[in-house]
């Protein structure tokens, strides 16, 4: 079974093409027009062992909001499409990741019920040109369009770059765990028989 997807999204604000291979090796080719997001998506894919190719062009002359949110939408849709009927997956993933002084956790349930809990209290600030509140916008769009419960918790940390990096790494690792195939799972991991 090949678990891949290619998604294109074209709006008046963004043009995005994304290809995902869930069963990859963490290889990436990413160009979003938002350098800090490129860095975070590289980390997400590398630590989740997903192959990810992304080309995006957005109205970044205004700000990065539309591009970041729309990439979250497209990445979520790609996972949803690649997972298809979710047969044989673990469904759940939970990881805690350190990044120097920072510790962050991500918990995933590929349930078909989108919900984000984002306990990452950050000041209104920037990392380079990137508004840190856009990380939450990205994860909200990703959770909604992937159809997952996603809980991200910052246990502690000071450096904004490290905090966001730990969150992306943790989500990548948790998604890897949740999407992993388990030969013991017959059908889907649900007493309802559907996810």
From Swiss-Prot:
Instruction: Please provide one cellular component term from the Gene Ontology annotations of this protein.
Output: cytoplasm
Q: Main localization of the protein?
A: cytoplasm
**What family does the Swiss-Prot or TrEMBL record give for this protein?**
Belongs to the imidazoleglycerol-phosphate dehydratase family.
Cellular location of this protein? Cytoplasm
Name the PANTHER family on file.
IMIDAZOLEGLYCEROL-PHOSPHATE DEHYDRATASE, IMIDAZOLEGLYCEROL-PHOSPHATE DEHYDRATASE HIS7
Is Ion transport one of the keywords UniProt gives this record?
no
Q: Which InterPro entries match?
A: IGPD_sf, ImidazoleglycerolP_deHydtase, ImidazoleglycerP_deHydtase_CS, Ribosomal_Su5_D2-typ_SF
Name the UniProt record assigns to this protein: Imidazoleglycerol-phosphate dehydratase
A Gene Ontology annotation in the biological process aspect, one of them, is: L-histidine biosynthetic process
> What does the organism's lineage look like at the top?
Bacteria, Pseudomonadati, Thermodesulfobacteriota, Desulfuromonadia, Desulfuromonadales
- Keyword Amino-acid biosynthesis present in the record's keywords: the answer is yes
Annotated catalysed reactions: D-erythro-1-(imidazol-4-yl)glycerol 3-phosphate = 3-(imidazol-4-yl)-2-oxopropyl phosphate + H2O
């Amino acid at each position: 079974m090949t678990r891949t997807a290619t998604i294109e999204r074209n709006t008046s604000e963004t043009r995005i093409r994304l290809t995902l291979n869930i069963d990859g090796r963490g290889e990436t080719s990413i160009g979003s027009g938002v350098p800090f997001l490129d860095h975070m998506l590289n980390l997400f894919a590398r630590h989740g062992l997903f192959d990810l190719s992304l080309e995006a062009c957005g109205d970044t002359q205004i700000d990065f909001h539309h591009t970041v949110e729309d990439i979250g939408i497209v990445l979520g849709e790609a996972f949803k499409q690649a997972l298809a009927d979710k047969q044989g997956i673990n469904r759940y993933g939970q990881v805690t990741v350190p990044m120097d002084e920072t510790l962050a956790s991500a918990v995933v349930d590929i349930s078909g019920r989108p919900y984000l809990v984002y306990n990452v209290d950050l000041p209104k600030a920037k990392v380079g040109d990137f508004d840190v509140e856009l990380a939450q916008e990205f994860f909200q769009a990703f959770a909604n369009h992937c159809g997952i419960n996603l809980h991200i918790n910052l246990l502690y940390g000071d450096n904004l770059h490290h905090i966001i990096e730990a969150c992306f790494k943790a989500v990548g690792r948790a998604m890897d765990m949740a999407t992993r195939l388990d030969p013991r799972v017959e059908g889907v991991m649900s007493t309802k028989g559907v996810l």
